[in-house]
């Protein structure tokens, strides 16, 4: 026969110092880890570092915990079991930056000196679907004023962020590279793709499933946006175009073709 006797779990005393909500000496279970001690101390305060939480044992630093490893990667390699007399020291953060705009987790992040824009983008969850990914903008304090840096995509992995930086990721422009539109007396009004198989007025009318019976064939117009954002109006002989007596008209991006109804003329 084997007889087991359960004894009491041994307690240890740990000092939690520095930038925590309630610094002091805490009595913990001998199975307690660094996170248990931080929880008892109320967590890190607003100026405390989450990137470098030191465990000091017998005067030597035996672990340097980066909470981001747990939050971002699920790693807990430095959340070691504590021993009696251990000291947990939380220093003030060194670098706090803010990322705004079209990322999945826009907020403040604590960054290490060697970390880059690319690292920050990973922490923030990456771009949203409507983000402009080719470049971003950084506002940085410089003495008594600020400076703006436009960082291109190729430099994300090498451009280091600095304390106080404000990074903004813009959205893509609300413009289209290959859009045309048809309105009026056709069966399917709306937006269409300008491509190799559909790039003329006649082809657009066909794509819209043709003209309705009330379409006015003697005149239609194209509203065309020019490079200076002014507009040009082009007259279209729809009847001549369909019977082959008038040349088809090539379309350009953002053209809007209006086919009036005979009822509009009354």
Model segments located where?
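Ser/Thr/Pro/Gly-biased, low-complexity, turn-/loop-rich segments
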Residues: 1-266
């Amino acid at each position: 026969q084997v007889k087991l006797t359960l004894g009491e779990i041994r307690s240890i005393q740990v000092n939690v110092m520095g930038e925590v909500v309630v610094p002091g000496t805490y009595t913990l279970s001998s199975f307690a880890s660094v996170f248990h001690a931080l929880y008892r101390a109320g967590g890190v305060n607003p100026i405390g570092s989450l990137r470098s939480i030191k465990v000091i044992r017998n005067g030597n630093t035996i672990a340097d915990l980066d909470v981001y490893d747990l939050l971002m990667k699920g790693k807990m390699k430095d959340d070691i079991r504590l021993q009696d007399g251990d000291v947990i020291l939380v220093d003030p953060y060194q670098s706090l930056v803010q990322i705004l705009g079209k990322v999945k987790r826009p907020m403040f992040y604590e960054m290490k000196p060697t970390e880059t824009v690319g690292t920050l983008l990973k922490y923030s969850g990456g771009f949203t679907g409507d983000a402009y990914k080719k470049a971003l903008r950084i506002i940085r304090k410089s003495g008594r004023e600020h400076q703006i840096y436009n960082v291109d995509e190729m430099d994300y992995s090498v451009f280091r962020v600095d304390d106080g930086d404000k990074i903004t990721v813009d959205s893509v422009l609300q413009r289209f590279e290959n859009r045309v539109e048809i309105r009026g007396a056709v069966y399917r009004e709306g937006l269409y793709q300008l491509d190799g198989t559909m790039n003329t007025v006649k082809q657009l009318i066909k794509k819209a499933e043709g003209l309705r019976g009330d379409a006015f064939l003697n005149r239609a117009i194209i509203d065309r946006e020019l490079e200076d954002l002014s507009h040009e109006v082009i007259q279209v002989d729809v009847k001549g175009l369909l019977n082959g007596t008038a040349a088809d008209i090539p379309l350009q991006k953002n053209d809007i073709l209006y086919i009036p109804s005979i009822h509009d003329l009354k």
